[in-house]
């Protein structure tokens, strides 16, 4: 069972949570540190905290033990209107937005892929794809110090988009549909770690939407100077589904050799 998490300070997350609560109904509940808590009619916890979502490293301490992982309803800040899904972590020496340096949160490839595919279908049905890019993001920000996997689903990129009823409806419908139908039927032709590409990784996103791939952590070109064998091993170890492939996208020779050595060490397919 997953738990739906949001920050009460976040207009995108809290607005989407309100719609989910209206559509599914449920009973009020109480959990430590939670400012809002609903046990939805489908048995899923919908929980809001005062802390910003990037600082939720305490989730394992306050959520019931039978929760398998977390889906965070969140805003996204960036350049253009987007509907995004990503894993969290700090693949480098700095952690300005939550979590710890050199630390990756547990990844949930099957859930991330299922959410992205459903998000695109819903966005198409609602007529949003002409305005919004539906995309994965590379791994970034906190929280990182969790034992169970976490996936962020987001509305971007400014307050104008965060508060729109249609974007919140799209996120809410995506999550509800995923829980009702797609959670048990997500297929992964490959489970991959992604290396290279931009922060909004076109190649890796296409692999999910068009080729049936599911992704663990994605290391964008902006963090490749920090990439080490230890980070790749951490991504491998902290992935709920078994990784079988490393996908490269326009990486320098040093990184290509590092990826090759990593893939050979763990018996993974290397795809360029």
Curated annotation (Swiss-Prot):
Its cofactor is Zn(2+). It catalyses: a D-aminoacyl-tRNA + H2O = a tRNA + a D-alpha-amino acid + H(+); glycyl-tRNA(Ala) + H2O = tRNA(Ala) + glycine + H(+). The keyword Metal-binding applies. GO terms for biological process: D-amino acid catabolic process. Its EC number is 3.1.1.96. GO terms for molecular function: D-aminoacyl-tRNA deacylase activity; zinc ion binding. Pfam families: tRNA_deacylase. Belongs to the DtdA deacylase family. Monomer. This is D-aminoacyl-tRNA deacylase. It comes from Hyperthermus butylicus (strain DSM 5456 / JCM 9403 / PLM1-5). The lineage of its organism: Archaea, Thermoproteota, Thermoprotei, Desulfurococcales, Pyrodictiaceae.
């Amino acid at each position: 069972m997953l738990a739906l998490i949001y920050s009460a300070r976040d207009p995108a997350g809290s607005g989407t949570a309100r719609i989910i609560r209206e559509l599914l109904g449920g009973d009020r509940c109480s959990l430590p540190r939670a400012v809002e808590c609903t046990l939805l009619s489908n048995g899923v916890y919908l929980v809001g905290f005062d802390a910003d979502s990037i600082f939720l490293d305490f989730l394992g301490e306050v959520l019931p033990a039978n929760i398998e992982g977390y889906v965070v309803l969140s805003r996204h800040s960036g350049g253009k209107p987007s509907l995004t899904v990503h894993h969290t972590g700090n693949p480098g020496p700095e952690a300005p937005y939550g979590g710890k340096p050199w630390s990756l949160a547990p990844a949930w490839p099957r859930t991330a892929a299922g959410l992205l595919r459903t998000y695109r279908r819903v966005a198409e049905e609602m007529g949003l794809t002409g305005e919004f890019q539906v995309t994965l993001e590379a791994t970034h920000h906190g929280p990182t110090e969790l034992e169970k996997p976490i996936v962020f689903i987001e509305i971007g990129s400014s307050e104008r988009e965060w508060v729109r009823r249609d974007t919140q409806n799209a996120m809410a419908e995506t999550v509800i549909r995923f829980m009702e139908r797609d959670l048990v039927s997500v297929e992964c032709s490959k489970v991959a770690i992604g290396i290279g590409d931009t922060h909004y990784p076109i190649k890796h996103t296409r692999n999910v939407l068009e080729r049936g791939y599911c992704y663990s952590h994605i290391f964008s070109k902006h963090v490749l100077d920090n990439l080490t064998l230890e980070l790749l091993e951490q991504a491998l170890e902290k992935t709920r589904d078994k990784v079988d492939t490393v996908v490269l996208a326009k990486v320098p020779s040093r990184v290509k050799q590092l990826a090759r050595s990593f893939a050979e060490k763990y018996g993974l397919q290397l795809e360029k």
